Curated annotation (Swiss-Prot):
Broad class of where this protein is predominantly found: endoplasmic reticulum
Residue windows of the LRR repeats: 62-85, 87-110, 122-147, 150-166, 167-190, 198-221, 223-242, 243-268, 283-306, 308-332, 333-356, 363-386, 390-413, 415-440, 472-496, 498-521, 522-545, 547-574, 576-600, 602-624, 629-652, 654-677, 678-701, 703-725, 726-749, 751-774
Protein name as annotated: Toll-like receptor 9
Coiled coil: none
Gene this protein is translated from: TLR9
Length: 1032
């Protein structure tokens, strides 16, 4: 809505730019538009599709900026002056602005140009990230640089002059400059001694560069050297000469095992890799060594001589399946803490048993052992016999080995063991002790091996989508048996596992009826995960053998609940004295269950994904289903197909509730006053429902509500002061709704206390003079993503753009734009017409001018009537509450508050009538002091009382003044309209308006009503029938 569109378009752009600059200079808008200032001096400009570095205002506190992130934009040219004003800039991120064509999503060619002094102008710069940019040379860099990332670029040559002068540099990343995703004609060329001048360099990463040898002349200060996934197939002591300070060396993936590769792979030549016995002997400070994916068939003990400080050794994805059972290479690694031997399987072979070599017993400091993907079918005492005396062993990974027989009791002999992962196997029940035979069984055909990245499973308690269940990471002993073939659970499985505290049995096929005897040996169990099974909850003593059970996950056990006619008993919950967390989510519970849950200890219940709507529809049968949970603090009722939530439903929830989730239901109405029935409620989640307005009341006074999530609804209207009484409210999420504005009247004095006010993803109407801009600027510290993620939904030219694309407070409105255009057009027309008319008919014009001059005084006297006080007198039946509500909350708001400068003056009985005057005096004054008389009718068949009297006065005014002032608004159009209405529709259609049923037609209705109230009715009369009333 720029001023004076069309003819003055260049002028409008100038006015807008000047207005925006003025606003920025005054400090009223966010200082770093279009970017966002975040804590710790970070200016975030990520994902803004910028084509150049923003020119921030001189008034912005650029001196306080220490970090600038321009990640994932479209900046292809960096100038000398781009960063000169950031005098304290320390970190600069320019990643993903102009990626090489092969890395670009659309494979578009791109080249980034960096002028010579771009970074030299920032002498304080310490961290620079230029990754994923199409640059071929290293730009000039300041000597203050500490960390430099040039990964996934087109830099293929490093020589001594390239990084000269970077004496403070400690971290250098040059990964992926020449590999299958970023192909080149040759390998990365590192000249001998090219990095030798970097005396403080400690971290060097050259992964994925097609290197065939270790670069010569590396600085002796290096502590981390990463050379994985190149083509270095020989290693000798001279390759790592002088690197005595190395702590981590990664040379994995240089001679790959291609039958387990997840990306393009070059087969390792026969007889390689070749590692000299003394390759690592001089690296006495080495703590981490990675030899994964290196096609190793054996381990030479001499490789590890001198590595007394080695703590982490990764030997995964090799061919060490035989070596594991007899190697002596581990005897000297007394400090080793983590050992990874995963996916050292024999192609097409699965072992019947596995014996770990005796040298494993010398790893006295070993804390974590990963042997998943070896493929052996039986786990017995002899399998882990070598580990029995390791006092520090805490974590053991045995997943994805196709184990079908497992003696779980063997883990009772490991007093320090904290986590055992046996997931993704084929365990079907308890196993008898078996002697090891060492035999192998050949598979019948090729096996498709899963990728290693999908197998690095974390602990059982890794937080997921649901935050109700506690994590197992802090517990002393966790056993994960998820994704196996268990059909039943037998107490014999858990013999000698009394100290087990967390047990995962999810994603099995357990279909038995638990009766209180399945977990008898697990007297200390605190967390039990039985999700994604087929448990039959019939017995009232289920799980009662677990006296210390605190968390029980029974989610996704829907099959028994879907069986028609089968009952389910949940009374066992009352008999678990320590139970605090219970999940019954996604079970489709709808009928034939216990009428009430009872527990004195339960604090969190996840009941999402059920059909509570059907349960509450059964009269009072399940009305008190949750009432017996006296200590309940958190309750999740999401995805329960709720269409309504009656006050009695909330009244029968536990009064101790602090968090209530009602996400993703079908709620189109919510009784806000009923929140008073939950006196301790602090957080309410109503996201993903079908609320269209916040108009029925307001948040009750005295509520303890602190967090309210209303995102993902269709809210388009909020009544004033809706949130004002919730004085403790601090976080409000209104994102992804249909709001066209955000009014300060919604919040009252609460606005300043809000810590989070999320209004992103709303179609805000960015009209000139939009009041929400000033309000959002006042509370901008609480609005996440205000500069870039709060966007306009209309008008069309601003749709999808930031609300600060132009300053909506200083731009001119549309009416003034037309005035500017009309005046300029008139000036041009007069400058052309006046000389021409003067030349052709000057005397005639002089005569007409004086004739009009003599005629004007009479017209002036005739029009010299006092200006009317109101634009319209609104008449309606106050007895009809729905009509009165529409007049006060819709009609008045639209015509008086939302029209800006074109606001109309309405005369309302209860607001504008003068006390002390008679009814008739006020009525007469209202009709004769208003330009129009607006009748708001619910129906047209019966009109009486004040409506009838007002109509007669309006008709009298028609007879006396010859002015038709009647405008009809019919809220509920019916087929049987009065004859007067039908006649008036014939003669003067624009003065009879019908309230549209569809919200999409309301905008047109208000426009028509504004026209009907501001123009004379005689212009609306149908000329085929009459000419309308005329003045004398």
């Amino acid at each position: 809505m720029g001023p004076c569109r069309g003819a003055l378009h260049p002028l409008s752009l100038l006015v807008q730019a000047a207005a925006l600059a003025l606003a920025l200079a005054q400090g009223t808008l966010p200082a770093f538009l279009p970017c966002e200032l975040q804590p710790h001096g970070l200016v975030n400009c990520n994902w803004l599709f910028l084509k150049s570095v923003p020119r921030f205002s001189a008034a912005a506190p650029r001196g306080n900026v220490t970090s600038l992130s321009l990640y994932s934009n479209r900046i292809h040219h960096l100038h000398d002056y781009d960063f000169v004003h950031f005098v304290h800039l320390r970190r600069l991120n320019l990643k993903w602005n102009c990626p090489p064509a092969s890395l670009s999503p659309m494979h578009f060619p791109c080249h980034m140009t960096i002028e010579p002094n771009t970074f030299l102008a920032v002498p304080t710069l310490e961290d620079l990230n230029l990754s994923y940019n199409s640059i071929t040379t290293v730009p000039a860099l300041p000597s203050s640089l500490v960390s430099l990332s040039l990964s996934r670029t087109n830099i293929l040559v490093l020589d001594p002059a390239t990084l000269a002068g970077l004496y403070a540099l400690r971290f250098l990343f040059l990964d992926g400059n020449c590999y299958y995703k970023n192909p080149c004609q040759q390998a990365l060329q590192v000249a001998p001694g090219a990095l030798l001048g970097l005396g403080n360099l400690t971290h060097l990463s050259l992964k994925y560069n097609n290197l065939t040898v270790v670069p010569r002349g590396l600085p002796p200060s290096l502590e981390y050297l990463l050379l994985s996934y190149n083509h270095i197939i020989t290693l000798a002591p001279e390759d790592l000469a002088n690197l005595t300070a190395l702590r981590v060396l990664d040379v994995g993936g240089n001679c790959r095992r291609c039958d387990h590769a997840r990306n393009p792979c070059r087969e390792c030549p026969k007889g390689f890799p070749q590692l000299h016995p003394n390759t690592f002997g001089h690296l006495s400070h080495l703590e981490g060594l990675v030899l994964r994916d290196s096609s190793l068939y054996s381990l030479d003990p001499r490789w590890f001589h001198g590595l007394g400080n080695l703590m982490v050794l990764d030997l995964s994805e090799n061919f060490l399946y035989d070596c594991i059972t007899k190697t002596k290479a581990f005897y000297g690694l007394a400090r080793l803490r983590r050992l990874n031997l995963s996916f050292n399987y024999h192609k097409k072979v699965s072992f019947a048993h596995l014996h770990l070599a005796s040298s494993f017993g010398s790893l006295l400091s070993l804390q974590e052992l990963d042997i998943h993907g070896i493929f052996f079918r039986s786990l017995s005492k002899t399998t882990l016999q070598s580990l029995a005396h390791l006092p520090m062993l805490q974590r053991l990974h045995l997943q994805l080995n196709f184990i079908s027989q497992a003696q779980l009791s063997i883990f009772g002999a490991f007093p320090g063991l904290r986590y055992v992962d046996l997931s993704d196997n084929r365990i079907s029940g308890a196993a008898e002790p078996a002697a090891a035979t060492g035999e192998v069984e050949a598979d019948c055909g090729e096996r498709v091996w899963p990728q290693s990245r999908d197998l690095a499973l974390g602990p059982l308690g890794t937080p997921g989508s649901e935050a109700f269940m506690p994590s197992c990471r802090t517990l002393n002993f966790t056993l994960d048996l998820s994704r196996n073939n268990l059909v039943t659970v037998q107490p014999e499985m858990f013999v000698r596992l009394a100290r087990l505290q967390c047990l995962g049995l999810s994603h099995n096929s357990i279909s038995q009826a638990v009766n209180g005897s399945q977990f008898v040996p697990l007297s200390n169990l605190r967390v039990l995960d039985l999700s994604h099974n087929k448990l039959d909850l019939y017995h009232g003593r289920s799980f009662t053998e677990l006296p210390r059970l605190e968390a029980l996950d029974l989610s996704y056990n829907s099959q028994p609940f879907s069986m028609r006619g089968v009952g389910h008993n949940l009374s066992f919950v009352a008999q678990l004295p320590a139970l605090r967390y219970l999940s019954l989510a996604h079970n489709g519970i709808h009928s034939r269950v216990s009428q009430q849950l009872r527990s004195a200890s339960l604090r969190a219940l996840d009941f999402s994904g059920n059909t509570l709507s059907q349960m509450w529809a059964e009269g009072d049968l399940y009305l008190r289903f949750f009432q017996g949970l006296r200590s309940l603090v958190q309750l999740d009722l999401s995805q329960n197909r709720l269409h309504t939530l009656l006050p009695r439903n909330l009244d029968n929830l536990p009064k101790s509730l602090r968090l209530l989730r009602l996400r993703d239901n079908y709620l189109a109405f919510f009784n806000w006053s009923s929140l008073a029935l939950l006196p301790k409620l602090e957080a309410l989640d109503l996201a993903g429902n079908q609320l269209k307005a916040l108009s029925n009341g307001s948040l009750p006074n005295g509520t303890q509500l602190q967090r309210l999530d209303l995102s993902g609804n269709s809210i388009g209207f909020v009544v004033p002061s809706f949130f004002a009484l919730a004085v403790r409210l601090r976080e409000l999420n209104l994102s992804a709704n249909a709001l066209k504005t955000v009014e300060p009247s919604w919040f009252g004095s609460l606005a300043g206390a809000l810590k989070v006010l999320d209004v992103t993803a709303n179609p805000l109407h960015c009209a000139c003079g939009a009041t929400f801009v000033d309000f959002l600027l006042e509370v901008q510290a609480a609005v996440p993503g205000l500069p870039s993620r709060v966007k306009c939904g209309s008008p069309g030219q601003l749709q999808g753009r930031s609300i600060f694309a132009q300053d909506l407070r200083l731009c001119l409105d549309e009416a003034l734009s037309w005035v500017c255009f009309s005046l300029s057009l008139l000036a041009v027309a007069l400058s052309l017409a006046v000389p021409m008319l003067h030349q052709l008919c000057g005397w005639d014009l002089w005569y007409c001018f004086h004739l009009c001059l003599a005629w004007l005084p009479r017209r002036g006297r005739r029009r010299g009537v006092d200006a009317l006080a109101y634009d319209a007198f609104v008449v309606f039946d106050k007895a009809q509450s729905s009509v009165a509500d529409w007049v006060y909350n819709e009609l008045r708001v639209q015509l008086e508050e939302r029209r800006g400068r074109r606001a109309l003056r309405l005369c309302l009985e209860e607001r504008d009538w003068v006390p002390g005057k008679t009814l008739f005096e006020n009525l007469w004054a209202s009709v004769y002091s208003s330009r129009k008389t607006l009748f708001v009718l619910a129906r047209t068949d019966r009109v009486s009382g004040l409506l009838r009297a007002s109509f007669l006065l309006a008709q009298q005014r028609l007879l006396e003044d010859r002015k038709d002032v009647v405008v009809l608004v019919i809220l509920c159009p019916d087929a049987h309209r009065s004859r007067y209405v039908r006649l008036r529709q014939r003669l003067c259609r624009q003065s009879v308006l019908l309230w549209p049923h569809q919200p999409s037609g309301q905008r047109s209705f208000w426009a028509q009503l504004g026209t009907a109230l501001t123009r004379d009715n005689r212009h609306f009369y149908n000329q085929n029938f009459c000419r309308g009333p005329t003045t004398a």
